[in-house]
C-alpha cells in the first residue's frame, strides 16, 4: 500500500501480521501441543488424548522424543506470536522530493531498538541497489545505497517478488529519486567460491524520461541480463 504524488512518495510496509504467519503460528502451536500431550500421557499412563492410547506409546524413547519436539515447537510458536503481536518489521518509507528528505521507519523488538528510524538527505543517495540471488532458494532484495552509511534494505528477504515486480519497483523508485540502479547478481556456487558478484548499472534513470523509463523497464529483464552478461544498457 502506498501513496504517491509528484513530489512525495509514502509506502506502508507490512510487518509480521500476515495471514501466512498467523496460519503457521496456529498450526505450529496446535501440533506442538499435541506432541507434548502425547508425551505427557505416556509418562503418566493416562489418556489425555483419546486418539492415542497411552498403553501403545512407551515413554522411553517415543514419549521423551515427542515431549522434546512439543516443547521446542511451543517455543518457536511463542516467538511467532510475539512477532505478530509486536508487528515486527512494519513501518513506512517516505521520500519527499520537495524538502529533499528521506525517512525510513520500522518497528523492532521491544527494547533499545523498538523504533528504528533513519533520516537522511536525498542528495546523499548514490543508487537503488537490487540484489538477485539465483538458485534453489531465489532471493530478490531492494535496498538504497547511502553515502557514508552503506545500504539500507527497503524490502524483506522473505518477500517473494517476481523478477518483473522487483524490476518495476526499482525502476519507478529510481526515476522518482533520479538515481541509477545497481544490480548485484549472485549464484550459490559463485557465492561459495568467489563471494558476491560485482555490481553493474542496468540503466541510468537520470537520462530517461518517464515514458522511456516505463518502456525500458518492460523490455529489460534481469534474467536475460544475467544470462547474457551484457554491458550496461545506456539511454
Swiss-Prot record:
InterPro entries: PSI_Ycf4_assembly. GO terms for biological process: photosynthesis. GO terms for cellular component: chloroplast thylakoid membrane; photosystem I. The chain crosses the membrane at residues 21-43, 63-85. Keywords: Chloroplast, Membrane, Photosynthesis, Plastid, Thylakoid, Transmembrane, Transmembrane helix. It holds the Pfam family Ycf4. It is found in: Plastid, Chloroplast thylakoid membrane. It is a multi-pass membrane protein. The keyword Transmembrane applies. Seems to be required for the assembly of the photosystem I complex. Belongs to the Ycf4 family. This is Photosystem I assembly protein Ycf4. The gene is ycf4.
Amino acid at each position: 500500500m502506498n501513496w504517491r504524488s509528484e513530489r512525495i512518495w509514502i509506502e506502508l510496509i507490512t510487518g509480521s501480521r500476515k495471514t501466512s504467519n498467523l496460519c503457521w503460528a496456529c498450526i505450529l502451536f496446535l501440533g506442538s501441543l499435541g506432541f507434548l500431550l502425547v508425551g505427557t500421557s505416556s509418562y503418566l499412563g493416562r489418556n489425555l488424548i483419546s486418539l492415542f492410547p497411552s498403553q501403545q506409546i512407551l515413554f522411553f524413547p517415543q514419549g521423551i522424543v515427542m515431549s522434546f519436539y512439543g516443547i521446542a515447537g511451543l517455543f518457536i510458536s511463542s516467538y511467532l506470536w510475539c512477532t505478530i503481536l509486536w508487528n515486527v518489521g512494519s513501518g513506512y518509507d517516505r521520500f519527499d522530493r520537495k524538502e529533499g528528505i528521506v525517512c525510513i521507519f520500522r518497528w523492532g523488538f521491544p527494547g533499545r531498538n523498538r523504533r528504528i528510524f533513519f533520516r537522511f538527505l536525498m542528495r546523499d543517495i548514490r543508487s537503488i541497489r537490487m540484489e538477485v540471488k539465483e538458485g534453489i532458494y531465489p532471493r530478490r532484495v531492494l535496498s538504497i545505497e547511502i553515502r557514508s552509511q552503506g545500504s539500507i534494505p527497503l524490502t524483506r528477504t522473505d518477500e517473494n517478488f517476481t523478477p518483473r515486480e522487483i524490476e518495476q519497483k526499482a525502476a519507478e523508485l529510481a526515476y522518482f529519486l533520479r538515481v541509477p540502479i545497481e544490480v548485484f547478481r549472485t549464484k550459490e556456487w559463485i557465492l561459495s567460491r568467489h563471494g558476491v558478484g560485482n555490481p553493474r548499472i542496468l540503466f541510468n534513470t537520470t537520462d530517461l524520461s518517464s515514458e522511456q523509463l516505463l518502456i525500458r523497464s518492460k523490455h529489460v529483464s534481469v534474467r536475460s541480463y544475467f544470462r547474457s552478461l551484457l554491458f550496461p544498457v545506456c539511454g
